[in-house]
Every structure is written in structure tokens, then in C-alpha cells.
Amino acid sequence: MAQDLSEKELLRMEVEQLKKEVKNPRDLISKTGKEIKDYVEAQAGTDPLLKGIPEDKNPFKEKGTCVLS
């Protein structure tokens, strides 16, 4: 699609997108960083990547062995 548009049309689309983006509310990283850190620390107890998965609920655990004779 972009190949069919002229450079002027592409620049107009980019300006339209930038006008939309400039309206987005922005917060200071000092505020949002603390919020993210607090959230991660609060969720750490239930995070399976940190805590691990119980053996009985592990979907990747070997079900058993198969013996072919």
C-alpha cells in the first residue's frame, strides 16, 4: 500500500499520526518506574517464572514411560 502513495501522501499520513501521538498523556519516568517496580514486587509471589510451577500442575512433566516390546 505504501508503495502506491506519493511522498506527499506519506508525509501527510506521518503528520496525522504524529498529531494523534502528541495528544497522548505522558507521565514522568520517576513516577511510572516506581509504579512498575511496586507492581512487579507485589506480583512476585504468584509469578511462575520466579516461584516455579508445582510438579502436579506442570503441563510439560513427563506423563510416564512407554515400553514397546
Curated annotation (Swiss-Prot):
Protein topology in the membrane: Lipid-anchor
Keywords annotated in UniProt: Cell membrane, Lipoprotein, Membrane, Methylation, Prenylation, Transducer
GO MF terms, alphabetically ordered: G-protein beta-subunit binding; GTPase activity
Residues annotated with Cysteine methyl ester modification: 66
Residue ranges of the propeptide: 67-69
Any one annotated GO CC term: heterotrimeric G-protein complex
UniProt record, GO biological process: G protein-coupled receptor signaling pathway
Location of the protein in the cell: Cell membrane
CDD domains, per database record: GGL
Lipid linkage positions (S-farnesyl cysteine): 66
A Pfam family: G-gamma
Biological role stated in the UniProt entry: Guanine nucleotide-binding proteins (G proteins) are involved as a modulator or transducer in various transmembrane signaling systems. The beta and gamma chains are required for the GTPase activity, for replacement of GDP by GTP, and for G protein-effector interaction.
Family to which this protein belongs: Belongs to the G protein gamma family.
Subunit structure: G proteins are composed of 3 units, alpha, beta and gamma.
Record protein name field: Guanine nucleotide-binding protein G(I)/G(S)/G(O) subunit gamma-T2
Organism annotation: Mus musculus
